[in-house]
């Protein structure tokens, strides 16, 4: 797969809704929906609070599928050594070591930023701490392989083509609670396993919880932000070259 295709997440091996790469739905069976307010309350009764969703939120149902991490790169020649060096650089936050693993034209953003020197500068700046933290979160999320191109995390290379990446997140774990309200003590609507969820309007990335809608069967609720990852979050692309594996891109967005 060409680097441009990998950056866009549009490779030929996308997972499709028919379950060609997954066999089980993403959520543990639970109640079919969050409690609904009474249709015709008595005049003297206090109306039940309206949930933060509107009908338009559910217009496009996500496929019922799970995207747990897989390592499809492990068997590639030279990958084990490359990944070990990558993991060590991330664990020690060694900007020079990461730059040494990078291609001469490593892509850093969609505005023309590139090169090992620029990568080293980004990682060494005060704002680099957030990049290092995100790279550490990527490492356990698997690796996809397509020809001579590797993609971390794995799920980025296996997204259904029908998914809107700007409005969808991945639940990063098994048994993650989908709650009726944005509270650690709120009742559980369901438990989710590496599921894709749609964001409801009013998303606030600084909040502790996000209002989401699951794939079929559709359920509405709240998931803790620390258990969600944007489909457009940072990823690492590596390419096999004559000099071994090299980081081709460290990039976020689309």
What kind of region is each of these model predictions?
Residues 17-59:
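Post-signal peptide N-terminal segment of mature Sec-exported envelope proteins
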Residues 10-14:
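Bacterial signal peptide processing site
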Residues 128-170, 213-254:
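Boundary regions of SH3-family modules and the immediately adjacent low-complexity/disordered segments
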Residues 1-8:
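Sec-dependent bacterial lipoprotein signal peptides
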Residues 188-227:
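SH3/SH3-like beta-barrel superfamily modules
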Residues 48-88, 100:
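Short, low-complexity N-terminal intrinsically disordered segments enriched in polar/charged residues
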Residues 106-121:
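Short, charge-rich amphipathic alpha-helical segments embedded
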Residues 94-105:
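Short, well-ordered alpha-helical segments enriched in acidic and aromatic residues
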């Amino acid at each position: 797969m060409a680097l441009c295709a990998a950056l866009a997440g549009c490779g030929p091996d996308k997972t499709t809704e028919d379950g060609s790469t997954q066999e089980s739905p993403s959520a543990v069976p639970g109640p079919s929906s969050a409690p609904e307010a009474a249709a015709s309350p008595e005049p003297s009764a206090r109306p039940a609070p309206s949930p933060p969703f509107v009908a338009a939120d559910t217009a496009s149902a996500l496929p019922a599928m799970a995207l747990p991490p897989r390592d499809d790169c492990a068997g590639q020649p030279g990958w084990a050594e490359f990944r070990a060096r990558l993991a060590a650089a991330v664990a020690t936050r060694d900007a020079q070591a990461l730059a040494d693993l990078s291609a001469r034209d490593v892509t850093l953003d969609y505005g023309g930023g590139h090169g090992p020197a620029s990568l080293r500068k980004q990682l060494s700046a005060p704002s680099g701490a957030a990049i290092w933290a995100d790279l550490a979160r990527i490492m356990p999320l698997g690796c996809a392989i397509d020809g001579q191109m590797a993609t971390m995390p794995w799920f980025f290379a296996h997204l259904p083509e029908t998914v809107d990446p700007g409005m969808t997140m991945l639940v990063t774990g098994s048994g993650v609670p989908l709650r009726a309200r944005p509270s650690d003590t709120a009742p559980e609507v369901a438990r989710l396993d590496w599921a894709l969820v749609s964001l409801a309007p009013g998303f606030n990335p600084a909040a502790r919880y996000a209002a989401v809608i699951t794939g079929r069967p559709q359920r509405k609720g709240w998931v803790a932000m620390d258990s969600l990852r944007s489909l457009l979050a940072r990823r690492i692309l590596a390419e096999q070259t004559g000099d071994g594996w090299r980081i081709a891109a460290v990039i976020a967005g689309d």
